[in-house]
Amino acid sequence: MKTIYKSKYYKIVCVLRWLWLKIRFGSKFHCPKPSMIGKRCGIYIFKNGKIKAKARIIVNDDVMLYAKGTLQIGAQFGINQYSRIVAHEQITIGDNVTIGQFVSILDHDHQYEMNDEQLQLNGYITAPVAIGNNVWIADKCTILKGVTIGDNVVLGANTLVHKDVPSNVVIGGSPFKILKQLT
């Protein structure tokens, strides 16, 4: 028995969603090959925003992609349910990157002040995020602004990435620690 995700009808509907995004956003959504866009995805591209994919991408159900800046995605990219990528400035994702469920990748923090015992939000502080090639980001990871993740990296579940990660490592924890060197 086939699951609905493997049925040809589901694939056709996903490709129609991709086509609708190409029509809706025009040159702001560059994805050269038909891609799988799941149900209830929030894909928002604002005035100066762009989403540029190198090749076909797989975006599972209930994912949010938010581009006020540039979101660049490499080949062989997949993102799973309930994850979000929010680019106010720039997020670059390399080739062969897989993102688990409930992952957040953010290139900004909120800027705020305390005035007369009242919290006042004053925009955002941004810094680019770069994720290398051959990276697996497990469930519930959070990647914060200004981070560079090297090539051939595995992020364990629930990892908080707040500083740069070297290549060829397995990391985990909150904040993260290097758990293993990959050869």
Predicted regions, residues:
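A short acidic, glycine-rich active-site loop
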Residues: 118-129
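Domain-scale signature associated with acetyltransferase and cell-envelope carbohydrate enzymes
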Residues: 1-106, 132-133, 141, 167, ...
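Conserved catalytic-core motifs of eukaryotic protein kinase domains, centered on the activation segment
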Residues: 109, 116-117, 181-182
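Short, conserved secondary-structure segments in the cores of folded domains
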Residues: 47-49, 69, 127, 145, ...
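Beta-rich strand-turn-strand
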Residues: 86-87, 139-154, 159-163
